[in-house]
């Protein structure tokens, strides 16, 4: 008779849970060791118990070396994934243009079915809408930047206008002080004679 299938869910009894953890951890370590020996693979295994105790296993290579290799590979994979997503974005448009070129240039035009043309048109419309959305986004950012610049220039203009007004008042007061009997003359400002 075979074993009955155990439902995979959290074991409520603490002692049963600990026994199961120990047995399964040992089984997992044994499987990792077998994989290392049979396939000549570098294997690193980390297990953390519910109480926070760390159990580890590593084959021939040092655990730290294996984890360093994993870290480097993972970083490279992330970079490649980022480049791939950018390339897919640009590549899909490039592929679409190549598809249009192959379907509609030369003698191939006569052999293209209506369904293929409809599908090609849908792809072109999708690419066009994506391009328009990106263009709109960039234009909105540009408008926002220009509005911000306009606001700064208006504020600067107000500051300069108030400074000019203050300078004008100071100049007018100085002129009034120099004219005889407080009268404002339309003539040029009075200058002092040169001293000999």
Swiss-Prot record:
Segments forming domain K-box: 80-170
Gene Ontology MF terms in the entry: DNA-binding transcription factor activity; protein dimerization activity; RNA polymerase II transcription regulatory region sequence-specific DNA binding; transcription cis-regulatory region binding
Record-linked Gene3D superfamilies: Transcription factor, MADS-box (3.40.1810.10)
Lineage of origin: Eukaryota, Viridiplantae, Streptophyta, Embryophyta, Tracheophyta
Tissue expression from the record: High expression in the vegetative apex and in root tissue and lower expression in leaves and stems. Not detected in young tissues of the inflorescence. Before fertilization, expressed in ovules, but not in pollen or stamens, of non-vernalized plants. After vernalization, not detected in ovules.
Disruption phenotype: Early-flowering phenotype at elevated temperatures (e.g. 29 degrees Celsius) but not at room temperature (e.g. 22 degrees Celsius).
Motif (Nuclear localization signal): 8-15
Gene Ontology biological-process entries: cell differentiation; flower development; negative regulation of flower development; positive regulation of transcription by RNA polymerase II; regulation of circadian rhythm; regulation of photoperiodism, flowering; response to temperature stimulus; vernalization response
InterPro entries found in the cross-reference section: MADS-box/MEF2_TF, MEF2-like_N, TF_Kbox, TF_MADSbox, TF_MADSbox_sf
GO CC term, one of those recorded: protein-containing complex
Swiss-Prot/TrEMBL induction comment: Epigenetically down-regulated by vernalization. Vernalization repression is initiated by VIN3. Repressed by silencing mediated by polycomb group (PcG) protein complex containing EMF1 and EMF2. Up-regulated by HUA2. Down-regulated by VOZ1 and/or VOZ2. Down-regulated by RBG7. Accumulates at elevated temperatures via a JMJ30/JMJ32-mediated epigenetic regulation (e.g. removal of the repressive histone modification H3 lysine 27 trimethylation (H3K27me3)).
Role this protein plays: Putative transcription factor that seems to play a central role in the regulation of flowering time in the late-flowering phenotype by interacting with 'FRIGIDA', the autonomous and the vernalization flowering pathways. Inhibits flowering by repressing 'SUPPRESSOR OF OVEREXPRESSION OF CONSTANS 1'. At elevated temperatures (e.g. 29 degrees Celsius), maintained at high levels in a JMJ30/JMJ32-dependent manner to prevent extreme precocious flowering.
Protein name: MADS-box protein FLOWERING LOCUS C
Residue ranges of every copy of the MADS-box domain listed in the record: 1-61
Subcellular location field: Nucleus
């Amino acid at each position: 008779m075979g074993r009955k299938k155990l439902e995979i869910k959290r074991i409520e009894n603490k002692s049963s849970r600990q026994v199961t953890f120990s047995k399964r951890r040992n089984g997992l370590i044994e499987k990792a060791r077998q994989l290392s020996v049979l396939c000549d693979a570098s294997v690193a295994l980390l297990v953390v118990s519910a109480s926070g105790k760390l159990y580890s296993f590593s084959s021939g290579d040092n655990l730290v070396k294996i984890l360093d290799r994993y870290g480097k590979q993972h970083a490279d994979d992330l970079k490649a994934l980022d480049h791939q997503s950018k390339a897919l974005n640009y590549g899909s448009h490039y592929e679409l243009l190549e598809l249009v070129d192959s379907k509609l240039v030369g003698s191939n035009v006569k052999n293209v079915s209506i369904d293929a043309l409809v599908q090609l048109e849908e792809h072109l419309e999708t690419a066009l809408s994506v391009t328009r959305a990106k263009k709109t986004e960039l234009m909105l950012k540009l408008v926002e930047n220009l509005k911000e610049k306009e606001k700064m220039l208006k504020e600067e203009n107000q500051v300069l206008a108030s400074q000019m007004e203050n300078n004008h008042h100071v100049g007018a007061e100085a002129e009034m002080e120099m004219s005889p009997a407080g009268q404002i003359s339309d003539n040029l400002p009075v200058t002092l004679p040169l001293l000999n």
